[in-house]
A protein has these predicted regions:
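Charged, terminal alpha-helix-loop-beta segments
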Residues: 1-233
Length: 233
């Protein structure tokens, strides 16, 4: 079913009451175009978000009682045949140790919840290059999720996490010293040639502007013979 531009905008107005879960809403993953203006849905949504940037400040922060560092995240899967491809890729990257442009892989599946009832996901990958700590929102090579979904999910985690405690916990427990005040960014981390990469080759003016405003710089993954490389284009 196709929707008009106005129908999408009205739906966004309805969803704005809970920005912590906004990225999960079905319309964020719509891949087609509006029935009237023939704009990509993600362009209409990105334009709306640019008009309502203040709403993103309503994403509720959570301070985790336990350490953000999880002992035992060694990159070795309990079930190598699991169908959770994204998680297996993240573990392989952890075992690799570091990657160009993003630095050392500190952790994967970093929890954000403090108590079970909290509505929060997990950080796919956390990396540090000596200057910048990055929340990387990883998508598997065949993922058909939109770049907009990827951007908003990562940004939601950025607003949810207690940055100071995250840095303190990892400095204390991981063995990697991260100075107080280190910059924290949230970035899409998707495969070059995949659906999200292809979106970025198109005329996505509002999406690209939204990414600039949110400082959501995309990085593209290339896998060669079991080794992961990272590019910016």
């Amino acid at each position: 079913m196709a929707y008009t531009r106005e129908q999408i905008r009205l739906r966004l107005d309805e969803l704005a009451s809970n920005m912590s879960l906004f990225y999960k809403r079905g319309c964020i993953n719509y891949r087609g175009k509006t029935s009237d203006s023939k704009e990509y849905y993600s362009e209409v949504i990105s334009e709306w978000l640019l008009e309502h940037l203040d709403l993103l400040n309503k994403i509720k922060p959570i301070t985790r009682r336990s350490s953000y560092w999880v002992d035992g995240h060694d990159g070795i899967p309990d079930n190598p045949d699991s169908n959770r491809e994204e998680e297996l890729i993240a573990m392989a990257m952890k075992r690799q140790g570091s990657m160009p442009l993003v630095g050392q892989v500190l952790d994967y599946q970093t929890p954000l919840k403090s108590v079970q009832k909290d509505k929060a996901g997990k950080i796919d990958l956390l990396t540090y290059d000596g200057d910048t700590l990055r929340i990387l929102e990883l998508k598997e090579p065949d993922s058909k999720e939109t770049m907009l979904r990827c951007v908003l999910e990562g940004y939601t985690y950025l607003k949810t996490v207690d940055k100071d405690k995250l840095i303190s916990d990892f400095s204390r427990d991981s063995g990697v010293v991260i100075p107080e005040g280190t910059q924290l960014e949230a970035c899409p981390f998707v495969f070059r040639g995949g659906f999200q990469w292809k979106e970025m080759q198109q005329d996505r003016t509002h999406l690209k502007r939204l990414m600039e405003v949110l400082n959501s710089k995309p990085y593209y993954v290339v896998e060669e013979n079991g080794t992961y490389f990272v590019t910016e284009d």
